């Protein structure tokens, strides 16, 4: 895992969210849409969160990721 890889994964996550009408997905759906491993997805979310591009909320069953 390196900075370039994390940036690439963050781009994949951003595109997956951007392609949704609601601009949000649950973690399970996001993992399926990007085909990233759990640690790759978490690193990408950390990257996007640090840049202020996403917001995370919880519902009863899943963590919801949404573009700002």
Residue ranges and their predicted role:
Residues 36-47:
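Short amphipathic alpha-helical interaction segments
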Residues 6-34:
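Short amphipathic alpha-helical interface segments
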Residues 1-14, 62-63, 68:
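Short alpha-helical segments that sit at the start of domains
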């Amino acid at each position: 895992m390196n900075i370039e890889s994390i940036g690439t994964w963050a781009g994949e996550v951003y595109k997956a969210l951007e392609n949704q009408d609601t601009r949000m997905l649950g973690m399970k759906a996001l993992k399926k849409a990007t085909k990233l491993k759990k640690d790759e997805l978490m690193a990408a979310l950390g990257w996007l969160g640090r840049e202020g591009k996403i917001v995370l909320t919880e519902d009863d069953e899943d963590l919801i990721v949404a573009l700002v």
